[in-house]
């Protein structure tokens, strides 16, 4: 008998294929404080039991493969395997389940969202035994959170840098998103900031195209920024998009923004990737830059209810990887986002601790210990009539960003900015006086428009604009 054969025999190796549930379905398991916990929405193929489907997810996203291998005997499966420890049927669905999986912390590299996602949302999402699979939520243990830097600065440090308190911050994405020359782009930035906005923003599509190279844009926008600051006496910012084709080029652009004295840069964190984003977040903390995050490509991942990954998971991943702002939908604008679900992940971004709350789609209690919070950004199809609802929904610790709702003003960019600033201050004052923004919002805007011709003009041009379509991703409810 060869030594190799003896080794196989000594560990009781038996070739073949066995059901995943024999090893990876463990309903008696009690999750540990150090485990990463995942809630998967699993839709098995017809004839596949829920226990087998949940166990398959646990196996294929941790130590398992399709057949027994003799090298299993060279390690401790019980120490490293993922475990499906609980299964709940989804209300109103005949063949859909929420499967809870616990992963030992040793499966993941410290401080790496990239490695965490490679395992948990890797090849298992193409597994043939499943018709569809969606990651609904993660519980990140404190022991793992402490291996990440997190946001470069956080909410309080940003407010101190800007010297702005007691209200949401106001922003604007420069439009048209593509095609402007750097000089005309800088002009629009100046007009918006001069009119009263706190920030202007590069569109996520704007990197360094032939019509406007990044260095030219940075120079003209910096000039606009300083001119507006000098004339208003307020600290202003422009989100310089540092996203690039390589990490080296991305850092070079961030360095140039810092040399210009810019307070903030921007990154498209999903198209750019988590490794690039974490690298940029570390640079921003070391060099005093705020980091604005755009979520371009998120709907490819999170919009379908049965397959992919919910945005609350992407939001948690961003808080680990690092960002001071992130786009989070609007509830009332042109982009997808149900109110309760949106408020659920907004709290996950900002708060130190969130409890399980099925009414908002939160599957796990999550503690962030000392990790700084992230400002949610409401952006996409919003205008002055939305200001009361946005102020009431998102509160002070947010950025309200009006692109077309600023540059689409009939009198020009600066009057559009004035209209938004006046509307915001009216809503904040009314709220502080105890008025109900949800019920009295339209009245509050009309009252203030009597004293602001810019606001009155904006109210007139957008009075009929609504985006009333049903949300695709909604909370689970029993069918009647």
Curated annotation (Swiss-Prot):
Main localization (coarse): plastid
N6-carboxylysine: modified positions: 201
The record's account of how the chain is modified after translation: The disulfide bond which can form in the large chain dimeric partners within the hexadecamer appears to be associated with oxidative stress and protein turnover.
EC assignment: 4.1.1.39
Residue(s) carrying N6,N6,N6-trimethyllysine: 14
Pfam families found in the cross-reference section: RuBisCO_large (PF00016), RuBisCO_large_N (PF02788)
Localisation per UniProt entry: Plastid, Chloroplast
Molecular function (Gene Ontology), one example: monooxygenase activity
Alphabetical keyword list: Acetylation, Calvin cycle, Carbon dioxide fixation, Chloroplast, Disulfide bond, Lyase, Magnesium, Metal-binding, Methylation, Monooxygenase, Oxidoreductase, Photorespiration, Photosynthesis, Plastid
Pro-peptide region(s): 1-2
Cofactor, how bound (note): Binds 1 Mg(2+) ion per subunit.
Keyword Plastid included in the entry's annotation: yes
GO cellular component terms attached to this protein's record: chloroplast
The protein, known as: Ribulose bisphosphate carboxylase large chain
């Amino acid at each position: 008998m060869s030594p190799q054969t003896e080794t196989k025999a000594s560990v009781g190796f038996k070739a073949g294929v066995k059901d995943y549930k024999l090893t990876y379905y463990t309903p008696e398991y009690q999750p540990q404080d150090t485990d990463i916990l995942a809630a998967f929405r699993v839709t098995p193929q017809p004839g596949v039991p829920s226990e087998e489907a949940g166990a398959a997810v646990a196996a294929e996203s941790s130590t398992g493969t399709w057949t027994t291998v003799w090298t299993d005997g060279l390690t401790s499966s019980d120490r490293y395997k993922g475990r499906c420890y609980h299964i709940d049927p989804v209300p109103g669905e005949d063949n859909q389940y929420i499967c809870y999986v616990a992963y030992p912390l040793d499966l993941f590299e410290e401080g790496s969202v990239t490695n965490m996602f490679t395992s948990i949302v890797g090849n298992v999402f193409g597994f043939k035994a499943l018709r569809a699979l969606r990651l609904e939520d993660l519980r990140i243990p404190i022991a793992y959170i402490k291996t990440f830097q997190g946001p470069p600065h956080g909410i309080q440090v940003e407010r101190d840098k800007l010297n702005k308190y007691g209200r949401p911050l106001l922003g604007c994405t420069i439009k048209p998103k593509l095609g402007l020359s750097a000089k005309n782009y800088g002009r629009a930035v100046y007009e918006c900031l001069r009119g009263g906005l706190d920030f202007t923003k590069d569109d996520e599509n704007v990197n360094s195209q032939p019509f406007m190279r990044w260095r030219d844009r940075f120079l003209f926008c910096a000039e606009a920024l300083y001119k507006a600051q000098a004339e208003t006496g307020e600290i202003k910012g422009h989100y310089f998009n540092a996203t690039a084709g390589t990490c080296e080029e991305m850092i070079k652009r961030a360095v140039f923004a810092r040399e210009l004295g810019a307070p903030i840069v921007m990154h498209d964190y999903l198209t750019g990737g988590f490794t690039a984003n974490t690298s940029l977040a570390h640079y921003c903390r070391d060099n005093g830059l705020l980091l604005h995050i755009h979520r371009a490509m998120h709907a490819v991942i999170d919009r379908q209810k049965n397959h992919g990954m919910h945005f609350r998971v992407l939001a948690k991943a961003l808080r680990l990887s690092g960002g001071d702002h992130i786009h989070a939908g609007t509830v009332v604008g042109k982009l997808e986002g149900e109110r309760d679900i949106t408020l659920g992940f907004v709290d996950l971004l900002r708060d130190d601790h969130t409890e399980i709350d099925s009414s908002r789609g939160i599957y796990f209690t999550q503690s962030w210990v000392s990790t700084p919070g992230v400002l949610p950004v409401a952006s996409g199809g919003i205008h002055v009539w939305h200001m009361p609802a946005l102020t009431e929904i998102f509160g002070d610790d947010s950025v309200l960003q009006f692109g077309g709702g600023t540059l689409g003003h009939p009198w020009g960019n600066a009057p559009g900015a004035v209209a938004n600033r006046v509307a915001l201050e009216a809503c904040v004052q009314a709220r502080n006086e105890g008025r109900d923004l949800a019920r009295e919002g339209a009245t509050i805007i009309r009252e203030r428009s009597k004293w602001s011709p810019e606001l009155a003009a904006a109210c007139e041009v957008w009075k009929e604009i609504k985006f009333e379509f049903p949300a695709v991703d909604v909370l689970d409810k029993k069918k009647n």
